[in-house]
């Protein structure tokens, strides 16, 4: 029995050594990923002339294997409250899949071209800034009351609703009303480069999940006009063409998805 003691000690030593090596390797990989994300965030900030570092994530494990192969599985970039000449503030998002780093380093220089297998690009305007633009200070934007889409509640993988029948609720003071009303609004894009967002009010909504406030017939046209507008300058990160527009939560989102594109960090912010 006593002869087993040295064997047990040897096994314990081997296991402890292996665990230490594994923990060290994971720690090294994690540290390298954090440094790469920090440098990428700083490079995006400088390239896009942002006021602060955007949120950046390089996804996939192990990181070092991806860096050595000059190929990242996925990168997420999110910049909130970016100055926008038309609406005041907007958020910019991009998700890059299958990124070829052949022409750049694992730290990704701002001007280095990256071949991206799939790129999802979004510009997001919250209810507050849409309302300020429309001069409806208490505006709340919501997805259509009836969605027949997937489990995310939207028609896209990122959970964006359809573009028809969004619910806009607010007080149309310019029309002479002092109570909140709910209006059905359709979204569309126009212009040669599809960067003008058109909001078209189509009718008053009453009943559950609305302000449930009718509008007098003599005020209807004015209210619908007040809830209709055009918002120019909606350029998506990396200049991707829009493919959908809708709501998520209380935000309006324009999204573009492209396959097989070459971009660099200088193109993240377009306006």
Per-region residue spans from a language model:
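Short amphipathic alpha-helical segments
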Residues: 32-36, 122, 215-219, 223
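Extracytoplasmic/luminal low-complexity segments enriched in Pro/Gly and acidic/polar residues
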Residues: 200-271
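Short secondary-structure junctions
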Residues: 47-54, 136, 234-239
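Hydrophobic membrane/lipid-contacting segments
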Residues: 97-102, 156-218, 252, 257-259
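N-terminal beta-strand/beta-hairpin edge segment
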Residues: 51-131, 135-174
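Hydrophobic membrane-targeting and insertion signals
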Residues: 1-68, 84-86, 266-271
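Short, solvent-exposed secondary-structure boundary motifs
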Residues: 130-131, 171-180, 228-239
């Amino acid at each position: 029995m006593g002869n087993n003691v040295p064997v047990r000690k040897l096994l314990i030593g081997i296991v402890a050594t292996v665990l230490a090596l594994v923990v060290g390797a994971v720690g090294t990989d994690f540290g390298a990923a954090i440094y790469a994300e920090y440098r990428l965030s700083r490079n995006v900030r400088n390239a896009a002339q942002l006021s602060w570092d955007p949120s950046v994530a390089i996804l996939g494990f192990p990181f070092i294997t991806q860096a050595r192969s000059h190929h990242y599985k996925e990168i997420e970039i999110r910049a909130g409250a970016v100055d926008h000449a038309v609406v005041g503030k907007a958020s910019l998002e991009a998700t890059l899949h299958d990124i070829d780093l052949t022409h750049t380093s694992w730290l990704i220089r701002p001007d280095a071209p990256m071949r991206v297998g799939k790129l999802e690009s979004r510009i997001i305007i919250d209810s507050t800034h849409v309302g300020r633009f429309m001069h409806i200070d208490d505006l709340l934007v919501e997805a259509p009351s009836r969605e027949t889409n997937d489990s995310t509640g939207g028609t896209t993988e990122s959970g964006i609703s359809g573009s028809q029948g969004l619910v806009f609720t607010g007080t149309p003071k310019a029309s002479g009303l002092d109570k909140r009303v709910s209006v059905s609004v359709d979204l569309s894009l126009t212009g040669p480069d599809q960067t003008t967002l058109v909001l078209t009010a189509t009718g008053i909504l009453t009943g559950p999940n609305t302000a449930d406030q009718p509008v007098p017939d003599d005020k209807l046209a004015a209210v619908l006009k007040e809830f209709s507008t055009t918002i120019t300058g909606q350029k998506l990160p990396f200049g991707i063409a829009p493919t959908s527009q809708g709501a998520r939560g209380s935000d309006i989102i324009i999204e573009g998805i492209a396959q097989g594109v070459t971009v660099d960090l200088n193109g993240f912010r377009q306006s």
